Amino acid sequence: MPLHKSAEKRLRQAARRNERNRARKKELKGLLKNMQKLIDANAAKSEVESAYRAAVQKLDRLGVKRYIHANKASRKKAQLTKMLNSYTPQA
């Protein structure tokens, strides 16, 4: 347990930030899974493209604000782009 008031405050702040960071990362994970699920379900190309745009937008935002490392955001965007470009819906 913290011995000083300032340490108690830092503990509270860290807990709030941790919760916010976890929520943002969980949201990103959901967007990435959604795109993969659409690809696996053989969805229309337009649906996959809209999921791609949402995921890339979230990756950009989290990378700029340093919730994830910028290189990780870039790497994930490249992987998603590769998946999107190679995707052709089966009739």
From Swiss-Prot:
Q: Specify where the region named Disordered lies, as residue ranges.
A: 1-24
Q: State the UniProt keywords alphabetically.
A: Ribonucleoprotein, Ribosomal protein, RNA-binding, rRNA-binding
Please name every pair of cysteines joined by a disulfide bond in this record: none
Q: Does the keyword Signal apply?
A: no
Q: A single Pfam family, by name?
A: Ribosomal_S20p
Q: Which GO terms describe its cellular component?
A: cytosol; small ribosomal subunit
Record's signal peptide:
none
* MF GO annotations: small ribosomal subunit rRNA binding; structural constituent of ribosome
Q: Provide one Gene Ontology biological process annotation.
A: translation
Residue ranges with Basic and acidic residues bias? 1-21
Q: List all membrane-crossing ranges.
A: none
Q: Which InterPro entries match?
A: Ribosomal_bS20, Ribosomal_bS20_sf
What the entry lists under PANTHER family is as follows:
30S RIBOSOMAL PROTEIN S20, SMALL RIBOSOMAL SUBUNIT PROTEIN BS20C
The task this protein performs is described as: Binds directly to 16S ribosomal RNA.
The UniProt entry's sequence similarity note says:
Belongs to the bacterial ribosomal protein bS20 family.
| Name listed for the protein in its UniProt record | Small ribosomal subunit protein bS20
Tell me which species this is from: Chlorobaculum parvum (strain DSM 263 / NCIMB 8327)
Query: What lineage is this protein's organism placed in?
Result: Bacteria, Pseudomonadati, Chlorobiota, Chlorobiia, Chlorobiales
